[in-house]
């Protein structure tokens, strides 16, 4: 058990070090900060829900495609909320230009939801896979850049999203 705790401590220190190198500072260029804020909001709750609700309503493609995205979003969100409360990792203390949506950092909900939706659509529409998945990954990165998550939080959220989309796709 002591070895496991030591490894976790080492990973946490490494994560904090990467965070300090990769996150913006208050002195970063305004255009850079605003770009990352725009990207992070584009992967937020409203946009993620709209990305599944609008296609369900407008029916631009087979509804089963959107149901995979909706189920992936819902299941991954539930997993994130349970894990956040179980782990209880506090957020970094220096956000840039945005507020913390809640007090827990691990895993990142934005990274999870944005990748869950974009990956579900990427599986259904492989011609658009690169920009879709790229955008989902970029939203995750924005959370580190803006100082609201550690890199490990984002990576964990992206693993949850990927596993959820895989599971839902296999079942559906």
Regions found by a protein language model. Name each.
Residues 1-13, 61, 65-68, 133, ...:
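Multi-pass membrane proteins that catalyze or facilitate reactions on polyprenyl-/lipid-phosphate substrates
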Residues 1-47, 80-101:
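N-terminal transmembrane-helix/juxtamembrane module of multi-pass inner/ER membrane proteins
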Residues 29-32, 61-66, 92-93, 126-131, ...:
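Membrane-helix interface segments
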Residues 44-46, 73, 111:
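Transmembrane alpha-helical core positions of polytopic small-molecule transporters
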Residues 51-78:
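Interfacial segments of alpha-helical transmembrane regions
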Residues 56, 80-88, 122, 169-172:
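Membrane-water interface at transmembrane helix exits
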Residues 70-86, 130-141:
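Small-polar-interrupted transmembrane alpha-helices in polytopic inner-membrane proteins
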Residues 96-172:
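Membrane-embedded catalytic cores of phosphoryl/pyrophosphoryl-handling enzymes
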């Amino acid at each position: 058990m002591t070895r496991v705790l030591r490894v976790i401590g080492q990973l946490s220190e490494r994560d904090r070090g990467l965070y300090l190198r990769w996150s913006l500072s208050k002195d970063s260029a305004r255009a850079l900060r605003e770009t990352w804020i725009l990207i992070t909001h584009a992967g937020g709750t409203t946009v993620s829900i709209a990305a599944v609700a609008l296609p369900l309503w407008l029916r631009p493609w087979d509804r089963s495609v959107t149901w995979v995205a909706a189920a992936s979003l819902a299941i991954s969100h539930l997993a994130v909320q349970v894990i956040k409360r179980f782990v209880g990792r506090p957020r970094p203390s220096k956000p840039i230009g945005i507020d913390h949506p809640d007090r827990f950092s691990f895993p990142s909900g934005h990274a999870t939801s944005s990748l869950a939706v974009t990956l579900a659509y990427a599986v259904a529409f492989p011609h658009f896979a690169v920009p879709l998945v790229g955008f989902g990954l970029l939203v995750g990165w924005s959370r580190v850049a803006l100082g609201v998550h550690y890199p490990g939080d984002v990576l964990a959220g992206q693993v949850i999203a990927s596993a959820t989309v895989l599971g839902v796709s296999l079942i559906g």
